[in-house]
Regions:
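Hydrophobic/aromatic-rich alpha-helical bundle segments in the mid-to-C-terminal region
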Residues: 114-119, 129, 151-197
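Helix-turn-helix
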Residues: 19, 23, 27, 31-65, ...
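Hydrophobic alpha-helical connector segments
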Residues: 69, 83-112, 164-168
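Amphipathic alpha-helical packing segments from all-alpha helical-bundle domains
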Residues: 76-79, 83-84, 127-153, 162-166, ...
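Short amphipathic alpha-helical elements of helix-turn-helix/winged-helix folds
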Residues: 27-31, 106, 171
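N-terminal intrinsically disordered/low-complexity leader segments
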Residues: 1-19
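Short coil/turn segments at alpha/beta junctions that flank glycine-rich nucleotide-binding fingerprints
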Residues: 34-38, 89, 110, 153
Length: 205
């Protein structure tokens, strides 16, 4: 009887994939900040998340995979919201402004995780590093696509598209990394407005 109950609980947890995945990510992020990447075990992550160990191992075979999950979570949050926000928007300039503001907000909301990625990326194994890099390229391609669209439409200058896309990514990360400096004189909204102005001034004919 007890065994059947436990098996059902594990299956139920696995079926509730998004919710469980987020619990694991949040627990891992908190523990990595508190204890460090090396000192944190998967067992501790499982306990902190309130998820059974078999279910945790269903999602994560090794700790480095959680870093990949953190990056995926940020990317999917950005992609999902962007699709909704730019639906019906044809103007590349407006589309880019929406994408920039949204990405900055996603990065700010996941600031602790962004810091972890910068601090602990050297701890990742080769496969996880490669996956994280691929995910970053996917983000840059979203911006590249919109910028390219603006160039083709004659709205934007013929800039180095890849370089501009990565400039945008790093501007968003800079708020997280250097917030201690900027927050003394800029609100987050001011920071976004000024960076967006820099981006559009560089792009517009």
């Amino acid at each position: 009887m007890t065994r059947s109950k436990k098996t059902l609980t594990v299956i139920d947890q696995i079926n509730a994939s998004d919710k469980v995945r987020k619990k694991i990510i949040e627990a891992a992020s908190t523990l990595y900040v508190q204890k460090g990447f090396t000192a944190t075990s998967i067992e501790e992550i499982s306990e902190k998340a309130g998820v059974s160990l078999p279910v945790t191992y269903h999602y994560v075979k090794k700790k480095s995979e959680i870093m990949k999950m953190i990056m995926e979570d940020a990317l999917y949050a950005f992609q999902e919201n962007l699709i909704k926000e730019i639906k019906g928007v044809d103007d590349p300039e407006e589309k880019l402004a929406i994408a920039v503001v949204l990405y900055f907000k996603v990065m700010d909301g996941q600031g602790e995780k962004v810091l972890l990625m910068y601090q602990k990326s050297s701890s990742l194994d080769k496969a996880s590093k490669s996956k994280v890099m691929q995910l970053e390229v996917q983000v840059s391609q979203i911006f590249s696509g919109i910028i390219e669209e603006g160039i083709q439409s004659g709205i934007f200058n013929a800039v180095d598209v890849d370089l501009m896309a990565y400039n945008i990514i790093l501007m968003a990360h800079m708020w997280v990394l250097k917030r201690w400096h900027f927050k003394k004189r800029l609100s987050f909204d001011n920071y976004i407005d000024q960076q967006l102005a820099i981006i559009l001034n560089a792009l517009k004919l």
